[in-house]
Structures are given as C-alpha cells and as structure tokens.
C-alpha cells in the first residue's frame, strides 16, 4: 500500500470511529462494538503508516520544505550575581515565621462504600 493510500485509510477509520462514538455515547451497543473493532484496525494501519513513512523518508520520497522562519537568535547568558544580604535575611525571617505557626490538621474525608447493584449468582 502506498503512503497516500494508508493515510486515506487512517482518515476514513477515524471518521468512522468518531461517527460511531457519538452513537455509542447514546447507548447504541452495536456502535460501541464497531468503535472497538475499528480502533484495533486503526492501530494496525497506524503501525503500517509509521513503517511506510520511515521508509519513504529514508529513500527520499518525502521531502521536507525549508522553514520560512528565521533561525532563532542565540541569547547571551548573563552572569549570575550573588544574592543581596538583605533578601537573604528576609528569607531567614520568613522561614522563622513559618516554623513558629502551628501546623493545622485537616481531617481526611472517609470513603463510604456504596452497595453494588450487581445481582447475586443464580443457582
């Protein structure tokens, strides 16, 4: 299969999955099954697409267009200066204030187990 055919097949599968997903959300069980099977097909086609695209790139079939953006400018790194003593002293005092406050305890919410709606096994 050619790369274009594989891409078209992937698009068709994606459209099909999206269409069936809308139906499955409304409760259509057949559509949910189609979504599951189509997603498996899509996975296989995606693997094939990856293989074909790598092969095409190596052989030169896929040519990348040169970017229209200008190359990024290199920024000069500024030298780091030592922090001022006043800010260091302020940081120490803020730590002391935080340490003096008592830690408030939050009560964890208990999880309530809901009874299951499943029926028991029939004998």
Swiss-Prot record:
GO molecular function, one term: structural constituent of chromatin
One matching Pfam family: Hc1
Biased composition (Low complexity): 85-102
Alphabetical UniProt keywords: DNA-binding, Repeat
Region: Disordered, residue numbers: 54-123
Extent of Basic residues compositional bias: 61-75, 103-123
Cited InterPro entries: Hc1
Its biological purpose: Might have a role analogous to that of eukaryotic histone proteins.
Similarity remark: Belongs to the histone H1/H5 family. HCT subfamily.
Protein's name according to its UniProt entry: Histone H1-like protein HC1
Gene expressing this chain: hctA
